[in-house]
Amino acid sequence: MVRRSFVMLAALIALALASLISTAPAQAAGNAKVYVVHGIPGRDLGLQPSLPVDVSVNGACALTRFKYTDTVGPIELPAGSYDIKIHLSASLSTPPCSGPVAVAATVPFASGENATIVAHLTDSGAPTASKFMNDVTPASVGNGRIMARHTAPLPPVDLIVKTFSSPATLAVIPNLANGQQVSAELPVNTRFRIQFALAGTTDPVRVGSVKARPGETVIYHAVGSVRKNTFTLIELRVQQ
């Protein structure tokens, strides 16, 4: 996992987005498969709640009004570096990518990797972007692969796994810090309850639900603030 921090929020989101936009052949051998998740609520930073941005890549406007909780991917991306510019989204009547340029950057990706870039907040509430490798290892028969990523402005948490039909705890994943992820197998087509509790406690600060699916890695990103009521789980489904 690689983390980059940026001064401007729009810059960090767009840096992730711009990495994904390409006119490369869809099935070229050796390409990287890249996804991106917008996990920063503007409300947490006193900005427009959906925090839309536009992205130009190699001089062309490639993505417009990408908003909080949106996802993009997979994009087949040949190994190499991509020149991008990030624009703050203006009004709908304004041409795309005509807003102020927040940043210009060159972003590399390696051949053959399967990755997600997540724009999110650190445990102290500062904007950042983290690159995670996606675990696409096939699960055993009858199971599916679930990944959970701590990308919310919270200190380390314990993930407590339960079913909806019983109060019994099935598993506890302790001390997961902001910017970290875990991968596990769960029976497919069964919804499980995931409680987020501050590390060493049992009282959940938030509760979500997850569901494993055959042939996919289902990734859940915890994003947003509990204090400002923007906390949510963003689901991303990656083919194995």
Where are these regions (language model features)?
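Bacterial N-terminal signal peptides that target proteins for export
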Residues: M1-A10
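Bacterial N-terminal signal peptides
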Residues: A10-S19
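Intrinsically disordered, low-complexity polar regions and short flexible loop motifs
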Residues: T23-Q240
